[in-house]
């Protein structure tokens, strides 16, 4: 016969004001640890966009039109290393640089290029472990086509001439110089430690 006597059930810890205060402090500490990360991502995207817009303005004569050797696009080489902040920074930078008030001669029609810029920057980031150069090349071709259509709409320029010329300019800045920037910064390793992805 089992003579063991079961004791009373364990009493849960008392919900004292001191205990609640301690739990609130722990929650605040967790939030404080997370929030700097978010602020770093937001500030990185903002700095990237500002740099893009500044470079587009500085090299305005060659950043638009048929030449379209937009030096600002060199920054896209940082997208595979930084990730989402750079994708958003690239998109916001294009949005700012393509404003008519900012000096874009094409007018509002050039704002359509914000969408492919976002999509192909995101694709570049997704391809970071497969082929960065392929991602940069796809970005160049896609933007070469959409910018050429914008030029055709604004100035009635022939697409057969525009697409190769515009794509070549974007390719040089993006796939060639952007890839060189990617290789150089990757070799340093600093961004990989700041933005592990």
What does each of the following model-derived ranges do?
Residues 16, 30-32, 44, 91, ...:
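Residue-identity detector for threonine
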Residues 27-92:
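Hydrophobic transmembrane alpha-helices
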Residues 57-71, 95-197:
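Membrane-embedded alpha-helical hairpins and interfacial helices in multi-pass inner-membrane proteins
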Residues 17-24, 55, 68, 105:
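A subset of signal/propeptide-processing and intrinsically disordered low-complexity segments
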Residues 4, 12-51, 157, 182, ...:
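Membrane topogenic helices and adjacent juxtamembrane segments
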């Amino acid at each position: 016969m089992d003579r063991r006597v079961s004791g009373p059930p364990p009493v849960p810890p008392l919900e004292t004001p001191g205990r609640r205060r301690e739990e609130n402090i722990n929650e605040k500490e967790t939030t404080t640890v997370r929030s700097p990360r978010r602020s770093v991502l937001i500030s990185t995207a903002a700095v990237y966009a500002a740099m893009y817009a500044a470079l587009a303005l500085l090299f305005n004569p060659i950043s638009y039109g048929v030449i379209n050797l937009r030096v600002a696009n060199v920054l896209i080489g940082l997208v595979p290393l930084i990730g989402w902040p750079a994708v958003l920074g690239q998109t916001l930078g294009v949005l700012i640089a393509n404003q008519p008030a900012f000096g874009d001669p094409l007018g509002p029609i050039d704002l359509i290029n914000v969408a492919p810029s976002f999509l192909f920057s995101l694709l570049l980031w997704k391809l970071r472990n497969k082929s960065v150069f392929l991602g940069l090349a796809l970005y160049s071709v896609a933007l070469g086509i959409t910018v050429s259509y914008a030029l055709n709409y604004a100035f009635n320029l022939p697409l057969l001439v525009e697409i190769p010329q515009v794509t070549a300019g974007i390719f040089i800045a993006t796939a060639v110089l952007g890839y060189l920037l990617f290789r150089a910064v990757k070799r340093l390793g600093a961004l990989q430690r700041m933005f592990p992805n």
